[in-house]
Swiss-Prot record:
Pfam families assigned to the protein according to its UniProt record, in alphabetical order: Oxidored_q4
Subunit structure: NDH-1 is composed of 14 different subunits. Subunits NuoA, H, J, K, L, M, N constitute the membrane sector of the complex.
UniProt KW Transmembrane helix keyword: yes
Annotated EC: 7.1.1.-
Record protein name field: NADH-quinone oxidoreductase subunit A
Annotated source species: Nitrosomonas europaea (strain ATCC 19718 / CIP 103999 / KCTC 2705 / NBRC 14298)
UniProt signal peptide: none
Record-level GO cellular component terms: NADH dehydrogenase complex; plasma membrane
Amino acid sequence: MLNTMLGNYFPILLFILVGLAIGVLSMLAGWLLAPNKPDAEKLSPYECGFGAFEDARMKFDVRYYLIAILFILFDLEIAFLFPWAVVLKEIGWFGFVAMLVFLGLLVVGFIYEWVKGALEWD
């Protein structure tokens, strides 16, 4: 029985190993075959054809990170909604109510962010 189960997963293992081998071999070939002749022009930072205006390590406003986190949160909400919509008939009322609670919590969180001014750019 164990041998049969392992045999069923062999194509998946083979697919993963071939994918890893292709990735590693292509990176290794590029590293070995590409010319490596660094000079001042190649090592200088490129900014739209001009010299760099500022240091590349400038500080970002925290609001950028906040907006990124909020985007990921609501993007994950959509990722949960698609499978839920597909199996809605099979999961019945319990799944429907559970998703309504989930969406309700997200709406309450969104209202809280709005009231606190997390979406304002003053």
